[in-house]
Amino acid sequence: MALVRIGKVVRALGLKGHLGVAGSEGALGTLERVVLRHGAAEVERKVLEARPQGRLWAVRIDGVADRTGAEALVGAEVLAPREELGEAGEGRHYWGDLEGLPVVTVQGEALGTVTGLMETGAVDVLVVQGARGELLVPLAPYVEVDRAAGRVVVDPPEGLLEP
């Protein structure tokens, strides 16, 4: 079973064990089960409730009944079986589908590889490792994910690639 990273637990919400999950692109609203990866441990859990709450998803899972339990999972990756996920939609992407993709400019200059993503509140940010070191590239209109070619193409505004 191939697992895809669909988000990350970024905080506890409320007192009843809801997890604040960033980056799910709506997938959590359709899943019955998820896998949580926290450190080296992976555990599958039933999704009891999932609803949008601002830029996050408030998710309640089996086995987490209070805020303390939810706080213990902050930092955990949320994964789902690839076969249970539909397409993320036009202009939307599952985080796991972006990790590992090469990043190039529209001129063809290689910038590096997507090694991670950050949820910042306003827009998700690609973490790109390359010859220039680590670059942070916001998923803004000047970034195109070319699924057919399996790469990310950036038309960087002035200053984006400066150290």
Curated annotation (Swiss-Prot):
InterPro entries: PRC_barrel-like_sf (IPR011033), PRC_RimM (IPR056792), RimM (IPR011961), RimM_N (IPR002676), RimM_N_sf (IPR036976). GO terms for molecular function: ribosome binding. Transmembrane segments: none annotated. Keywords: Chaperone, Cytoplasm, Ribosome biogenesis, rRNA processing. One of its GO terms (biological process) is ribosomal small subunit biogenesis. GO terms for cellular component: cytoplasm; ribosome. Residues 90-161 form the PRC barrel domain. It is found in: Cytoplasm. An accessory protein needed during the final step in the assembly of 30S ribosomal subunit, possibly for assembly of the head region. Essential for efficient processing of 16S rRNA. May be needed both before and after RbfA during the maturation of 16S rRNA. It has affinity for free ribosomal 30S subunits but not for 70S ribosomes. Binds ribosomal protein uS19. The PRC barrel domain binds ribosomal protein uS19. Belongs to the RimM family. This is Ribosome maturation factor RimM. It comes from Anaeromyxobacter dehalogenans (strain 2CP-C). The gene is rimM.
